[in-house]
Amino acid sequence: MKPQRSGPLRHGVRGTVALNSEVCDDYPQVVEDAVALGWELMGHNQSNALYLHLMSAEEERRVVLATCERIEKATGRRPRGWLSSGLQESWHTLDYLVEAGPTYVADWINDDQPYLMNVGGQRLCSIPYSVEINDLPQILRAGRSSDEFERMIRRQFDTLYREGAKSGRVMAICLHPFIIGVPHRIGAFDSALAYIVRQEGVWPATGSEIIEHYLASGATF
C-alpha cells in the first residue's frame, strides 16, 4: 500500500501483519518498513501456498519452527502471534506453536474476546480474527463494493462498541493491500477508520498489546 494511501498511518493506527516468512527473503524492504513503523509481525507460514493440515506431522513442525525463526532473524524479535494460511490447522498445530514461541493464535474465529487454551499444560491465547470483516471474501469472492464493505465495518463496530461498554470487545479488520489499497477502494476504508478512531474509549492496539492487556486483567478463561 502506498504511503499516501495508508489510512492507518494518518489515524495513528499500527497494524498487525500476517507475514509469510518468505517475504523476508523476497521483499526485505517491506519487512524493514513495517518494523520501522512499529507494526507487529505475526507468523503466517512460509508461504500462502502451504497448508498445515495437508502436511505430515514432521513437515508441519519444521514449517512452524522455520517460519518463526526466519522472522526473528529478519526483525530481531520472535513473532508473538500466528495466523495459519487459510486458517487451516492440524491436530498438532497448537503444540508446535507452543514450542515455537508464539503466545497467541488467530485461527479460531469463534469469539469477540480473547480466551486461554490449555495446550499440553502450556498456555496459548486465542485472539479474535474475522472472515466477515475481511476484504478478500467480501470484495473479491462475494463481489461487494467498497461502500458496502465500509457499511459492514461500521455496523460491526457499532455493535461491538455497545457491547464493549460492559465488557471489552476486540474488532479485527482483516485486509490485503492489493485489494483495499487500490485507488477506488481506499477512501471507503479511510472513512470507516476515521469513524472508529474518533469514538471515545477506542484503543487501536496490536495483537500482542491486546493479549498482554488480557492476561494482565487476571483472566483465567
Residue ranges and their predicted role:
Residues 1-2, 6, 217-220:
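N-terminal regions that are enriched for targeting/export leaders
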Residues 104, 154-221:
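C-terminal domain-boundary segment and adjacent tail
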Residues 25-41, 94-105, 187-194:
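Short, electropositive alpha-helical surface patch
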Residues 69-73, 77-167:
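Active-site-adjacent pocket scaffolds in enzyme catalytic domains
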Residues 9-90, 122, 128-141, 172, ...:
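Metal-dependent polysaccharide deacetylase catalytic core of the NodB/CE4 family, i.e.
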Residues 55-63, 144-148, 184, 188:
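Alpha-helix N-cap and loop-to-helix initiation/capping positions
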Residues 4-5, 31-32, 61-68, 94, ...:
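Generic structural signal for well-ordered alpha-helices
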Residues 4-13, 71-77, 163-166, 196-201:
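A structural motif corresponding to the C-terminal end of an alpha-helix
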